[in-house]
Amino acid sequence: MPHQQILMLFGLLPVATNISTWWNFGSMLLACLTLQLLTGFFLAVHYTANINLAFSSIIHITRDVPYGWMMQNLHAIGASMFFICIYIHIARGLYYGSYLNKETWLSGTTLLIMLMATAFFGYVLPWGQMSFWAATVITNLLTAIPYLGSTMTTWLWGGFAINDPTLTRFFALHFILPFGIISLSSLHILLLHEEGSSNPLGTNSDIDKIPFHPYQTYKDMLMLTIMTIMLLTIVSFFPDIFNDPDNFSKANPLVTPQHIKPEWYFLFAYGILRSIPNKLGGALALTMSIMMLLTLPFTHTSKLRSMMFRPFMQLTFWTFTATFLVISWTATKPVEPPFTTISQVAALMYFLFFISNPIMGWLENKIMKL
């Protein structure tokens, strides 16, 4: 029977005995992706990619389409769940040295970039006030590119300002990118199982492994159940918790919101962008805030893989986590003292983590030799 063969495949998949709950977020991300694809399809059926009708079509979905409110809220809050899971997934990779599995890490970072692009395009689609102005601010960064900037911006906008062609192509990109994410996710999983998962100790797991089914399948199901309960609780009782009040008004190019800010999951990158008082410098810092993840497999100098036995690196990691939260917080505040100073210091500390990583490894190796 085909389903028995699938179970056999999972049953024969060897997994380290000591992997913790932090290793469950990969399967949760797969569940989030499936949810986003299904709800996204049903929303696309009723959505109209036109600047005069987009906002009204969202209202139509939530009011008139049977269970449209649920689809819309599941899709919007599901995106937040997706990013919560992916940030925990990346933090796990950083802490336990999973980035030393180079191919898996590099494909995962590419997935993150694609996911962020997809989420950005999706945020523009309701054509609310904050959607419009966030799109204006972020796409305007392309003009900072020397020589090509203005041409690229005009090409992306489909004119000399954000208008109907921009919304149409953003909808097309938001629809097509998830298929790229599916393909790359498959590659990511394939590359992971070439070498196998790491473990909290950062040691070779070959000497002590158990079958994936039933042990890990039940563990995955528990975490998926918890995530589903959380998601449905927010959808049912606090559906607007992540929404911006400005986005309940239709886009008006003549009125600028008092404070333009993206969704919460982009705040760290937006905070880094704002901390540099130069357009090109800010755009480069924004790009580097993600691209720095690509350097980790090549700058690891410690003899130990995991941070479990590296107290100095643990301190650095938790400082980095706090920095991430501080940048996100300052990005929600207006551009005035003391927030500008705090965000500049936090942005500097954010990048210092990637610089201190090889130095800490070298220092620990020296201490171990004493």
From Swiss-Prot:
Cofactor binding description: Binds 2 heme b groups non-covalently.
Topology within the bilayer: Multi-pass membrane protein
UniProt keyword annotations, A-Z: Electron transport, Heme, Iron, Membrane, Metal-binding, Mitochondrion, Mitochondrion inner membrane, Respiratory chain, Transmembrane, Transmembrane helix, Transport, Ubiquinone
Ranges annotated as spanning the membrane: 25-45, 69-90, 105-125, 170-190, 218-238, 280-300, 312-332, 339-358
Cellular compartments annotated: Mitochondrion inner membrane
GO CC terms, sorted: mitochondrial inner membrane; respiratory chain complex III
Note: Heme 1 (or BL or b562) is low-potential and absorbs at about 562 nm, and heme 2 (or BH or b566) is high-potential and absorbs at about 566 nm.
Subunit structure, interactors included: The cytochrome bc1 complex contains 3 respiratory subunits (MT-CYB, CYC1 and UQCRFS1), 2 core proteins (UQCRC1 and UQCRC2) and probably 6 low-molecular weight proteins.
Protein name: Cytochrome b
Lineage, highest ranks first: Eukaryota, Metazoa, Chordata, Craniata, Vertebrata
Gene: MT-CYB
